[in-house]
Amino acid sequence: MSFRTIEWRDNKVVMIDQTRLPGEEVYNVYEDFQSVAEAIRGMIIRGAPAIGVAAAMGVALGAREIIADTYESFSRQLTNVCDVLARTRPTAVNLFWAIERMKRVAESNKDRDLHFIRETLKAEAIRIEEEDLEICRAIGRHGAPLIREGATVLTHCNAGGLATAGYGTALGVIRAAHEAGKNIQVFADETRPWLQGARLTAWELMKDGIPVTLIADNMAGYFMKKGAITACVVGADRIAANGDTANKIGTYSVAVLAKENKIPFYVAAPVSTLDLSLKSGDEIPIEERHACEVTHLQGLPVAPEGVKVRNPAFDVTPAKYIAGIITEKGVVRGDYERELKALVGQ
């Protein structure tokens, strides 16, 4: 890929500004954890694995900002840093997974000097980024055999390199199939209201030379019924113990349409996206975002002033609509409750 989603550089965090794509490829530099939190909240960086990496790097930046003489004082302030980052996006479990991992690193080194702890936290954040890239490639390797020669794959939102440290989850599967020499095409839903499919997925695939056709969200059923789509692959922000999956709003509709038209619907996500503490998708918290995201498009009003708006950012697809969950450890099918537990060794 010819872009970097996020990286640690000279004790600063550098992110591609996804709100400026596809018009401008701009990289922002962040020197403090508060600005990283705002970048996550403002969707300058988005996608569950990517915001996990961003949160980890935010913790590492925050640790460098803390003024303390004792570990107890450092720990109290680090908890505040973590709390600020944790409040940015409530649905994506990778955010909380990364923050908890950083907390454990600090606690396990509490007997060391604070300089060592700060450097160890920086190293851990970089390690999380590097691991995510390897995980995405493994997801691609496991998922590519599910994409047959000549397939046309529908994807929703953006689960590509921009949503991860690189390569992608759903787009990682597509990339791996393409790299294996398969002649495939992609249909990308535009994904209202943020247009991640139009702005980001189409941009990524075109940069990689993978054939992509952009469609409006309400066209998916039409093309499925016509036989133009042969598989669906999406990412995930949180997966419950029974396989119910939270992903970008509109995913549930795509899954239902796929089932009706006998098209396999796959979820591609790292094991860190699993939340086995939740019995079902009914327990997944759903972020509700500002009304202006629906009433305005690129700053221009597209709805009457004062209209009532609902804007959930995610929906939950019941496991019965999912043909398989593709992870870095393999593909899970069927009895998700049993197989997901086995996957993580529970």
From Swiss-Prot:
It catalyses: 5-(methylsulfanyl)-alpha-D-ribose 1-phosphate = 5-(methylsulfanyl)-D-ribulose 1-phosphate. Catalyzes the interconversion of methylthioribose-1-phosphate (MTR-1-P) into methylthioribulose-1-phosphate (MTRu-1-P). Transmembrane segments: none annotated. This is Methylthioribose-1-phosphate isomerase. Its EC number is 5.3.1.23. SUPFAM superfamilies: NagB/RpiA/CoA transferase-like. Pfam families: IF-2B. Coiled coil: none annotated. The active site is at D237. GO terms for molecular function: S-methyl-5-thioribose-1-phosphate isomerase activity. Keywords: Amino-acid biosynthesis, Isomerase, Methionine biosynthesis. It comes from Geotalea daltonii (strain DSM 22248 / JCM 15807 / FRC-32). The record marks C157 as: Transition state stabilizer. Belongs to the eIF-2B alpha/beta/delta subunits family. MtnA subfamily. InterPro entries: IF-2B-related (IPR000649), IF-M1Pi (IPR005251), IF_2B-like_C (IPR042529), Initiation_fac_2B_a/b/d (IPR011559), M1Pi_N (IPR027363), NagB/RpiA_transferase-like (IPR037171). It comes from the Bacteria.
